[in-house]
Amino acid sequence: MLGILNKMFDPTKRALNKYEKIANDIDAVRGDYENLSDEALKHKTAEFKERLEKGETTDDLLVEAFAVVREASRRVTGMFPFKVQLMGGIALHEGNISEMKTGEGKTLTSTLPVYLNALTGKGVHVVTVNEYLASRDAQQMGEIFAFLGLTVGLNLNSMSKDEKREAYAADITYSTNNELGFDYLRDNMVLYKEQMVQRPLHFAVIDEVDSILVDEARTPLIISGQAQKSTKLYVQANAFVRTLKKDQDYTYDVKTKGVQLTEEGMTKAEKTFGIDNLFDVKNVALNHHINQALKAHAAMQKDVDYVVEDGQVVIVDSFTGRLMKGRRYSEGLHQAIEAKEGLEIQNESMTLATITFQNYFRMYEKLAGMTGTAKTEEEEFRNIYNMQVVSIPTNQPVIRDDRPDLIYRSMEGKFKAVAEDVAQRYMTGQPVLVGTVAVETSELISKLLKNKGIPHQVLNAKNHEREAQIIEEAGQKGAVTIATNMAGRGTDIKLGEGVKELGGLAVVGTERHESRRIDNQLRGRSGRQGDPGITQFYLSMEDELMRRFGAERTMAMLDRFGMDDSTPIQSKMVSRAVESSQKRVEGNNFDSRKQLLQYDDVLRQQREVIYKQRFEVIDSENLRDIVEGMIKSSLERAIAAYTPKEELPEEWNLDGLVELVNSTYLDEGALEKSDIFGKEPDEMHEMIMDRIMTKYNEKEENFGTEQMREFEKVIVLRAVDSKWMDHIDAMDQLRQGIHLRAYAQTNPLREYQMEGFAMFEHMIESIEDEVAKFVMKAEIESNLEREEVVQGQTTAHQPQDGDEAKQAKKAPVRKVVDIGRNAPCHCGSGKKYKNCCGRTE
């Protein structure tokens, strides 16, 4: 009954029927375009753009646009997309995944929706897994687009910012997923809008979509730099704070745990460090270190707030009294306590920006993908990316012979059988592709074949260009190729002369992967475009997957039958058990990726807020209103802390409030206790705010409006960037320890969301306080440069070669871009990183 219902309501079947009708319409107008001259065909692009401007949609133009690309492709490359390729292209245009078997021409299929969507002028990104494929496709398919008058850009890791900007400005941009993600992060660290390279994310077509959105979904892209806080500064600040006297040099409020330098304390600091003004923009880092050292000495008590254990500072939970191992105070307070206790100061490298592929690609207005194998991950694509998987039929029926698995007792017996099978096929001249799960297996089989004197090539997914070349030759007579799973993906194996008569390409699998999709990819290497072929998997009871579903029982059964190591069994029961084991593993992997996304969504929402506001800052001409708003909020919180509602007015610490207001917003003696005595908090706020605004206006008059506007930008950008980087670090530490909350019968995700939100709120307050303090206290130098914004903190540089970190079997791998000290600085100053943003003192 269920089967009948599935047939009636199968969404793929419905979609295919719809696509076939549209493909027939495209076929019907074929003759009209064949008769057009080259010029008339090229002119169609301008005509389509005009019609879009007049209100037509890309859907309205689909039939004509596809017919134009089809004809242009025939004239330029000699390739004419088949009807099934038209159907694949329509699926892509609708933001779905086209599952097209190997050799069915996915690259050519993509040109159809890419052209149609590029007509909008918003830019289309074609995403591939490596730079070799991006370069190859940009060159080959770029000819079709160039013929039709569209521009094509290629975005590579080695390019300068100007070259990248040009590549992104093109109608169509070919790039790798890594480069797109890193460019997005770097764009949100620039100081001037003109330094950004990407345009808003419009439409992306991802080749090998399962590899990028599933296999690499858990891989965070990370831009990191040396931790901005110099160890030396912590030690110096600590030594200085030890010389200060309470109430004379600093004040401490027990209730709020607030510590503040008095005017005397500030003068002492300026003398000790040989500077004119502690609040000058260039002394931001020093000021921060002194504040944290003060807090460490005055507010943080040993054995109350923290303990020292095994040379480490361990935080004590103030509610439960438990030790919170692995957690560190943020904003450099932890390092300040380490300096106070005379311990080694841990100065890890710092995460400056991070995003996962899942969240990067979900930002596109429309997303589509192509692969030979996506059906097994259909649920994941639907739930996480809202994309349907549409299996496109092959142009010619598949006549490949997929043989049942051969199961051996031991690995040794299995590998001997594989070598024997390869040797026999080699003797007849039939080409063989041996697929392995791990590099060690490739090397072991290579050794066995060497012993038999069989020449062969080994591929380990390291050199993409060489790889593509070897894979192309893997279908020639007598070729033997050993490849790990991902090697040579994206390149077709075309059969050489006389190979069809020998049975086509033989694919030999040496074990089942935990994902059926990877097994299907290996099978799909053979039997392309109706060619003959054969696939055979060899398994052993010692394989990891076999051990998972209880191979012991089967082993005992084999023993009873007295089977030796050289005799295989072919059993449907075992094959079914393997498949159900694979389904279980796939389910677990999906759950873990889904969970990662739920955690990552917390940071995603925060990232979007910060990046949006940061862009508004660099895009805005005048930040005065924003800064005034920040000062208001900061002052409101300060007044609320010193005038709590639950206390009587005579209990309020007005002396503390006056000290704070004068040292943070005004000048020594500008506010007296008598000015605010007897007033309500909102009256105090209004009066103090008036005085602050008077000082603000005087400052603007002295320095000139233009200089003041740039100064505000410098202060706001520096505060946002440094606090956001601290926040990313703190969120990372929270994330690493949060699973332990499950032991306390709480939901770790819920706790992470709540604490993450509280930390974000605190970060926003912290930004407002810092902006208020520095705008009011810092002096403006006449030659103010926005680059000063990053002094004392690191920003990013280009990713280094080889950052395509391979996914480990279980744990997520981090893709990290580190900054070389002698590399040119990212901020565009032209100086070396170590002499510019990487300067730590």
UniProtKB/Swiss-Prot annotation:
Subunit (UniProt): Monomer and homodimer. Part of the essential Sec protein translocation apparatus which comprises SecA, SecYEG and auxiliary proteins SecDF. Other proteins may also be involved.
Membrane-crossing segments per the record: none
Any GO BP annotation: protein targeting
Coarse class of the protein's main subcellular location: membrane
NCBIfam families noted in UniProt: PRK09200.1, PRK12904.1, secA
Keywords assigned by UniProt, alphabetized: ATP-binding, Cell membrane, Cytoplasm, Membrane, Metal-binding, Nucleotide-binding, Protein transport, Translocase, Translocation, Transport, Zinc
A Pfam family matched in the record: P-loop_SecA
Catalytic activity: ATP + H2O + cellular proteinSide 1 = ADP + phosphate + cellular proteinSide 2
Binding site for Zn(2+): 825, 827, 836-837
UniProt GO MF annotations: ATP binding; metal ion binding; protein-exporting ATPase activity
GO cellular component, one term: plasma membrane
Gene giving rise to this polypeptide: secA
Function, in words: Part of the Sec protein translocase complex. Interacts with the SecYEG preprotein conducting channel. Has a central role in coupling the hydrolysis of ATP to the transfer of proteins into and across the cell membrane, serving as an ATP-driven molecular motor driving the stepwise translocation of polypeptide chains across the membrane.
PANTHER family documented for this protein: CHLOROPLAST PROTEIN-TRANSPORTING ATPASE (PTHR30612:SF0), SECA INNER MEMBRANE COMPONENT OF SEC PROTEIN SECRETION SYSTEM (PTHR30612)
Species, as recorded: Bacillus velezensis (strain DSM 23117 / BGSC 10A6 / LMG 26770 / FZB42)
Name by which UniProt lists this protein: Protein translocase subunit SecA
Membrane topology: Peripheral membrane protein
Cofactor section: Zn(2+)
Chain segments carrying region Disordered: 786-812
Homology family: Belongs to the SecA family.
Binding residues for ATP: 85, 103-107, 492
Domain of life: Bacteria
EC number: 7.4.2.8
Note describing how the cofactor binds: May bind 1 zinc ion per subunit.
